[in-house]
Amino acid sequence: LFANVKINQRVVETGFEKLFVAPPMTDDGTALGAAWHVLSGDPNFNPKPLHSMYLGPSYSKEEIGSQVAEKKIQVRKPVDPAKEIASILAKGGVVALYQGAAEFGPRALGNRSILASATDPEINQTLNERLNRTEFMPFAPISRMEDAEQLYKNICRVQHSAEFMTVTVDCS
């Protein structure tokens, strides 16, 4: 149920002051949910906010280099990756981003992500066709944290959940 980001938005709109949906809200989070449930009965339990879901596997430069060589993939390292990515996206290109540890849970949060410009009205269809994805698979915007309140309505009520793509908000 809570994997449905639109339902999570509607829950907030019923009057909740704040909502946090645990990022691994599917089968892979069952053990975490069970642990939180048991701990919630302990009066000394003091939960802390989650700061990262980059808990999956990561690979050394040597392991990556070995696979790149074996698959004969061309690789180049830009001097300024952010600037290079922005330039590719501005020209309508698509970027596959692979860095650090993989995300734990069902959402691509930037370490295993495909980036594309949202200004192309056909981009959802294009990506779905290229990736063999179904039409209803969600896409999410990336924006700077300092711009969030200006861009998204009621973001203050769900900001922590939004960082993990577990809720939607309307755009301003």
PLM feature spans:
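Flexible beta->alpha loop and helix N-cap segments adjacent to enzyme active/binding sites
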Residues: 2-172
